Amino acid sequence: AVNRPDTIVLGMGLATLRAAKGNVCLETGNVQGLILAGLLFDAGEIKSDNLLVIGNEGQKSEDNGKNIYLSDLFFHVGGTDTDTPVSVKCCATINSNHVVGDNFWVWRADHGDNVAWEKNEAENGIIINGDDVTMYALMVEHFEQYQTVWNGDHGKVYMYQSEIPYDVPNQEVWMSHEGQKNGYASFYVDDAVDTFEAWGLGVYLYNRDASVELDTAMEVPDKNGVKVHNICTVMLTGYPGMNHIINESGDSVTFAGERKVICEYENGLIR
């Protein structure tokens, strides 16, 4: 645990932290001025709730003029040589306010040893609970529910890349909103959020193992102040398809190589 302000944790040669007993690999208190960089987090054979937790749950940090900086952080759920499947509930949870993230790759493995829907289980890639969190180059792939959940206000994302899981076995196990919607959007912004803005998003679909539908790539509350600029969806190959881009707006992608775009979205309107 890191509880002292202005601490720097720098991984030399991409230092790897692996959950051994269902534990969190690294967690911090609500302290400002932290810098974490150059770390790889691996899920373990005993399921953890998280691999990285920034800040205390339910206690957001005060604004003292110092951001927390998280750079070059990578997360693996499977994909390495192992005799036993690995799993985690969520790779990274950010509870603190005033966080800047740069270059996150959050990956549930789609190939390797003991990789399958009921083996390397992981619900979410990253959950943002803090306010004033900014992410640059956020890449989240193949998780079994929402790839990214954003609950904080005044969030900003510059470049987001995401692949929907390849290995969904059937539609019945992949339904959101208490079974009312097909699949889980890649990026989910909670209805309580009043201000959020994102630029340059790409969500990619490859239904490799079953014919299942994804209702929409991104869910946001339809409010003035919640804005999305330049988002595209692409069907890579496999079974179709993805029906919408944001909420119920945007055209579907249903054949290999098809790409659709929304340039500007706010409060239910495409501009």
Where are these regions (language model features)?
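Extracellular/periplasmic carbohydrate-active domains that bind, remodel
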Residues: 1-271
